[in-house]
């Protein structure tokens, strides 16, 4: 939480149930308490609604944040007209492609903090690039990796097996319910 408040750029990554959203809520509360103007966004409408519902704060799609202009197929927010915020927080960063990330970076004003949150082990964006994975592997941007499962649903076989597979371990295949489990 401290790094998200103090670092200029930060990535928070972890699998399902590791506490990304919980940390995000604390970070937002602290930043608001400090009087910082925060913009919260995600790549899709569904993702922005989910983060808005879980944090209780307004979140927008990246296209809305950057003010997409349908007439000229570009964004109104850019280096000449950046997003007005002290902090920009992007959730579900694994879904952001190279072109959208480039547009976002152009619209980040000097001195604005950028916090990117997502699961590096999710499928990459539909568009070109695997931005989150490339940023995490770059060793240029500070990365906080969350590994421990806290969510109660984390005890489900699907979540448990996803974490085992990500660590290169064999999934748990005992007690398979042929009607409800898929192999």
Can you annotate each of these PLM segments?
Residues 5-12:
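Pre-Walker A (Motif I) flank of P-loop NTPase domains
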Residues 17:
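Walker A (P-loop) phosphate-binding loop of P-loop NTPases
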Residues 20:
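Conserved lysine of the Walker
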Residues 23, 27:
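Hydrophobic positions on the alpha1 helix immediately C-terminal to the Walker A/P-loop
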Residues 35-36, 85, 110-113, 139-144, ...:
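Short glycine-/polar-rich loops that comprise or flank the Walker A/P-loop
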Residues 37-42, 46-107, 148-149, 158-159, ...:
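Conserved P-loop NTPase motor core of helicases/translocases
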Residues 98-112, 130-135:
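Short, conserved "post-DEAD/DEAH" coupling segment immediately C-terminal to helicase motif II
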Residues 120-183:
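Conserved helicase motor core of P-loop NTPases
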């Amino acid at each position: 939480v401290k790094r998200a408040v103090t670092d200029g750029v930060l990535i928070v990554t972890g699998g399902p149930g590791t506490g990304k959203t919980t940390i995000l809520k604390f970070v937002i509360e602290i930043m608001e308490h400090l009087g910082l103007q925060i913009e919260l966004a995600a790549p899709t409408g569904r993702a922005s609604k989910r983060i808005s519902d879980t944090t209780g704060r307004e979140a927008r799609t990246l296209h809305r944040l950057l003010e997409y202009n349908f007439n000229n197929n570009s964004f109104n927010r850019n280096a000449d007209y950046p997003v007005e915020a002290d902090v920009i927080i992007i959730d579900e960063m694994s879904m952001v492609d190279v072109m959208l990330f480039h547009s976002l970076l152009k619209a980040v004003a000097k001195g604005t903090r950028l916090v990117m949150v997502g699961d590096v082990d999710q499928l990459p964006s539909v568009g070109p690039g695997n931005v989150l994975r490339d940023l995490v592997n770059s060793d240029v941007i500070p990365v906080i990796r969350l590994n421990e499962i806290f969510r109660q649903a984390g005890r489900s076989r699907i979540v448990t097996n996803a974490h085992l597979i990500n660590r290169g371990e064999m999934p748990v295949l005992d007690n398979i319910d042929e009607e409800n489990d898929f192999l």
